[in-house]
Amino acid sequence: MGKIACITGPPGAGKSTVCSKLREYGYNCKEGNELAKEYGCLFDEEVDVECLEEKLAEDRFDGIICSHYSHLLGCSTVFILEADLNDLIDRMRARGYSEEKIQENIETQMSSIFYYESLERLPANRIFTLYNGNIDETAKRIISIIERSRNNK
C-alpha cells in the first residue's frame, strides 16, 4: 500500500473544499465516493469500506482521500476537520439534510468520534484535528504536516 493521508469530519466541515485546494497545489487528493465507484466498491449509494481498503492496497494508492469514512481506510495520517457548529448547521440545511440528520452529525463532531475511531488504528501523533476556518491555511497546514512526515522517513 502507498502512503495514504485521510481527511475526515462531519458533512459541511470543508473536506471537499480542502481537497480541491490541495489539488490546486498539485496533490493527489480524491473524494472517497469517487474512488469507491472507480474501484467497484459502491453499492446502492453505500460504500463498502472493506472493499475500498483492499482495492487501495492492491493499487498501492498514494495520495490523500477525503470523506466522512476515510479514517477507516488504512491511513498513515488522519486529518479531522471541524467547523463552527452554526456553520455546519447552515451548510447541512442548505444541502437539504433533515433536522434529525443534522443533530446526528453535530453530535458526531461534539463526541470526537472521528478521533476515537482513528485512535483505534493509528498512534495519536499521526492524528491531527484542524479547525477549518480559512481553507487556504488549512490546506497549507495539511501540506506542512505531510511534507514533514515524508522528510522524517
From Swiss-Prot:
Region entry LID, spans: 94-104
Span of the signal peptide: none
Keyword Cell membrane: no
Entry keyword set: ATP-binding, Kinase, Nucleotide-binding, Ribosome biogenesis, rRNA processing, Transferase
GO biological process, one term: ribosomal small subunit biogenesis
Binding site for ATP: G12, G14, K15, S16, T17, R95
Region (NMP): 31-47
Gene Ontology molecular function: adenylate kinase activity; ATP binding; ATP hydrolysis activity
Catalysed reaction, written as an equation: AMP + ATP = 2 ADP; ATP + H2O = ADP + phosphate + H(+)
The keyword Kinase belongs to this UniProt entry's keyword annotation: yes
Family: Belongs to the adenylate kinase family. AK6 subfamily.
Purpose of the protein: Broad-specificity nucleoside monophosphate (NMP) kinase that catalyzes the reversible transfer of the terminal phosphate group between nucleoside triphosphates and monophosphates. Also has ATPase activity. Involved in the late maturation steps of the 30S ribosomal particles, specifically 16S rRNA maturation. While NMP activity is not required for ribosome maturation, ATPase activity is. Associates transiently with small ribosomal subunit protein uS11. ATP hydrolysis breaks the interaction with uS11.
Name of the protein: Putative adenylate kinase
Source species: Thermoplasma volcanium (strain ATCC 51530 / DSM 4299 / JCM 9571 / NBRC 15438 / GSS1)
UniProt lineage: Archaea, Methanobacteriati, Thermoplasmatota, Thermoplasmata, Thermoplasmatales
